[in-house]
């Protein structure tokens, strides 16, 4: 199994005259069409078996598509004008920047999946289960799918079937270093009340600029502020929502998921959801995980592959760069 990571927005961008802090019209953007047959043939000849398409699900971006009902995200909670591909705005949508015709973005994604399959390779995409964008709003979810947080009890920090964690009666405070942006225009502000916990487990209304302040932590039924107690007596609401998202992309022809920060989501969810997925789909699951003591738990939950940066990668780096003994491998 040889995986090629392909960041779509940079792969096909031939613009070499880049402007610092420039927008799409100035710096350009790759598209699915940029991944042409010549590129696919070259990857096939290289021995690639799986192409990992990075940054395809719609995420925070300061580029607006009003004709699609998509607004630009607030600069106070957007990392760079192009946005972080791990700050998801709509789990059921494709980044319109990556399409020749933004109205046709889903079909253009399905086309690249088909063309990769025609070359005898498989498709992996990112699945970001731990957090989503602060301004998340789905414009493309199926009619029978409810939006995140619609029925949450916002008067408590935790409830099993809440999708988010809350800081009751407290307003979200933009990191101080970013608030200077607001002075450039009196129209720029961001209001969130009550504040929601940030993606890197910051259960406070005042994340720092080094936190994942642009994202909101999803609630899988663990009460982190009360002894990490688990509330899995019945399936939490978030579990059903996230399983449905993976099923949606499998139906689009996706063969597997590189799961972002899988270790921040309870292993019990993976055991349940991977079993549910594999009742229907032959899906590959790859976990981003940096805690070796958890490796076995996540493999036994159904993951096919895990990152081994902390184990093998760091050991090899220490041997090559710092003179560590080779018998430490």
Language model features: what each stretch is:
Residues 2-6, 51-53, 123-125, 257, ...:
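Hydrophobic faces of well-ordered beta-strands that scaffold small-molecule active sites
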Residues 1-122, 130-132, 137-141, 145-148, ...:
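N-terminal structural segment of carbohydrate-active enzymes
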Residues 143, 159-162, 166-172, 177, ...:
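Active-site-proximal helices and loops of the catalytic beta/alpha 8
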Residues 59-88, 129-211, 298-310:
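Aromatic- and acidic-residue-enriched segments that line the glycan-binding/catalytic groove
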Residues 9-11, 56, 128-130, 262-264, ...:
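Active-site beta-loop-alpha junctions enriched in small/polar residues
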Residues 40, 92, 110-117, 125, ...:
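Short, well-ordered alpha-helical packing segments
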Residues 11-24, 88-97, 204-234, 238-239, ...:
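Short glycine/proline-rich turn/loop motifs
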Residues 28-43, 231-251:
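Short, acidic/polar
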